[in-house]
Amino acid sequence: LAKSGTNDRGFSILSLETAMSGAANQLFRFEEVSPGNGYAIICKDGNLSLDVMDYSHQKLADIILTAHQSNSQVNKWWILEECSERMESSMTYTSDYKQPKTITDSRGNTVHYEYDDKNRLLTKLTDAKGNATSYAYDANTDKMTEVARMVDGKEVKVSYTYENEKVTSIGHNGFTYDYAYDPFGNLESVSVGGRELERTTLRSRNGLADRITYATGEAVRNEYNSEEQLAAQYLITADGREEKLFENTYDSCGKIARHKDLCSGVISTYQYDLIGRMVGTDRSDGMKLRKVYDEKNRVKGYTYQKDRVGHEVEFLYGDVEKQQKPGLGYGIKINGAQKIAYEYDALGRVIRTHNHFSDTNTSTQEYTYVSGKEAGVTTNLVASVREGNRAESYTYDACGNVETMVERSADGSERKIRYYYDALNQLVREDNQKQNKTICYTYDVGGNMVRRDEYRYIENPVITEAPWKSDTFEYQTGGWRDQLHFYNGQAITYDAMGNPLQYLGMQMEWEKGHQLKHITGAGLDMYCMYNDSGKRIRKTVNGVTTDFYLDGSAILMQTSSDGSRIDFFYDDKGNVFAMKYQNEMYFYRKNLFGDILGILDSHGTELVKYEYNSWGKLLNLTDYSSNGLGRRNPFRFKGYYYDEELGMYYLNSRYYDPETGRMLSPDVLEVLVVNVDSTAKNLYLYCDSNPIQRKDDDGKILHCVLVGAASAAFGMITTIATNIVTDEKWNDGLVEVGASSFVSGALSVSGFGPLGSAVGQAIGQGVIAGITEGYSLWKKSKTGGITAWDVTNSVINVGISISGGTHYQKKDSIYAKGKIRRMRNRIRDYNKAKAGGKRGVIARRKAELDRETKKLGEMVYKHSKPDWTSSLLNVVNNVVSGSQPVDKPKGGGKRVFYMRW
């Protein structure tokens, strides 16, 4: 900005010039003339300052220079607009502009893509650290047949075979997972290493699932009413005895009105509003739950009560009149008193969290974020978290993994942990000042940890001395080679389903395929009971029974036969943040990863401190309370529920053992066909051996990266493609979008191959517009208000429309070809499977729905392919930069507003 010439009335005016060092006419200074109100912008010589021609506020009025006075006139006060940083990414393309060639994030990290000679199929992906993944395809069908990556000189490879476009085998770690189908194409049986685990029998005429028979000899049989709704379910034991598990009664709208759990004896009745949202639950044991919604169909709050004691929780959302962002949560109230308040920056990132322990006691956590490569560019990666005189700071590698964490204590002392990862982002080493040791981890080509060595604390990258402690892991040499056979010489045996029977001094019994029923040994006698959705509702340990009262998978309250009761409270993301015990409120202190590090009372006094290793094993527990609060509190590492008696975490469908760093039992085989482009096919792994920033709340093989909410645009596509159409949880973190995930190689559209897959391209074009329209619908779906179909339809329709009016009209032909109808049927089958509560059936129906989604995506892609790359680039740039342009698509289609957060 320079003083340059005069206007027609002789006033000096300004123009843009190329910057030149030392040019006198380019030097200005800012002088505050009214605190908080404005500045005078004064030339270097001090005689002239910026003014507006004729004091005009009209568009195109000249900015001029007039004589400067010590007391500047009001018309010469300049209000400096607060300008936020930006997030940005960039893409380059192949020479024919058909495919992305590189994607670079805000930190300058780049992922490279290579394709076949026709630029159709992705053959190689090289992440930002130079690790390459190669892909091979069937020459006739383009089906992916192999995924491979080199890790420390060893090839990690997954292979696929197909029949009639269905996966029939997956090769991994020297054995295969096998899938068999009936003549109608329905999944009939699954096997591991040549041993059949379960078989599904359908009703006549390609009907619903009649029963599932497990390798242990048990079976689950379904019973339906005349409307083909699941009316009852039975467990058939190995000796042929039949036990009825539950009964369902439906209302005239097809929703469950009454559910009788015959195992616990509890009867639940449900109430819905006029648009089908669940607003109330009454249980025969006295538990009552009520929910209310706001005008945007978000859960505004809920109340629950048992034995005349209850609580009210209210979620506070952004209010435009208060200059808040309406799509974000601004706080939580408990019984009318605000307990959490959030502050955001211009990009929608949390910068402060205020915890109100009482009216007079508050603590504040402040967040800063990692800067981008250039000035003014930022990211969603958290750089530091500060609370009072205590702080944590973080750095990241090029793939977005946490590289260092420095913890500064209240006394000013600092302790540092440095993490190292291999080409699969598995944790291979940590230099841990907190534990005063260096720990190294070694894995086989199946991802199984084979050795854990501990040394004195060493910062040198090369370790030459011998470890002072080693843990060894030995695995099956045949069949299911991912099964841990010996841990430090202790033998582990398994049943036919892959569940452990003898485990580190304990004996275990299982039922319904994968549910842990009874544990004995080492002074422990523990029984567990589950509901129809497979969630644990009761445990009895050495004669003391604890009942869990759930809202979905969240434990609202637990009561024990010893007379104790604990209530738990959750934020708007579903993370537990407080508890009430013996009529006193307590609050959790957490780190960035969600680990509960301490418990504070209503005065802000820390009564309990926890310390874990990287895998969640409790190292130290300090308890200053007078009521044993440290042991009574069940939520610990990552906010998981910890069974103190068992020494394991319960993750809502499976148990996780922090001693071995592995899941106790395998996930269902059907999940393996969801991510065909991934090398992660080990059903026993916890978070793919990256426990630092990954989390597994529900015990499923699919997990999310937490740090900085670093789900980028492609992470959003992945989540939509795999979750939204199946009525699964749609991650709230999608509103906090960064670029780290897609640069770390998280470019896969789950179930449909790498970036170039049809559904990824189709949904990719409309992802932002689809989210804009589908977000409120999802909120309804999340709380039972609408079906997944409503959300799916919205995203698909808008996803098509983003390419323009011509493409939008193709929706009708898609309807005519029956693709939408078939998807609706698949969603119906999936929801019925969910009602049945069997994970195997659920996963099978989800896989079927994924395949139907792919077919629909391919059809959409045919009509939108010419413009998908440019549209997707707009999506990426606008999402990660936080801008909000209004785009008029080609062909006169709808105007699309990109979301801003």
Residue locations for each model-derived region?
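A short, polar/charged loop-to-alpha-helix boundary motif
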Residues: 672-681
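Short, low-complexity export/processing leader segments characterized by acidic and small residues
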Residues: 536, 598-599, 617-622, 657-664, ...
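Extended charged/polar low-complexity repeat regions
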Residues: 22-23, 33, 37-40, 82-443, ...
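Membrane-interacting helical modules
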Residues: 704-901
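A motif-centric feature for acidic-aromatic and gly/ser/thr-rich catalytic loops and repeats
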Residues: 91, 319, 367-373, 472-477, ...
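Lectin-like carbohydrate-binding module/patch detector with strong preference for beta-trefoil
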Residues: 1-84
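Short, tandemly repeated low-complexity microdomains enriched for cysteine and small residues
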Residues: 4-23, 58-70, 112-114, 156-159, ...
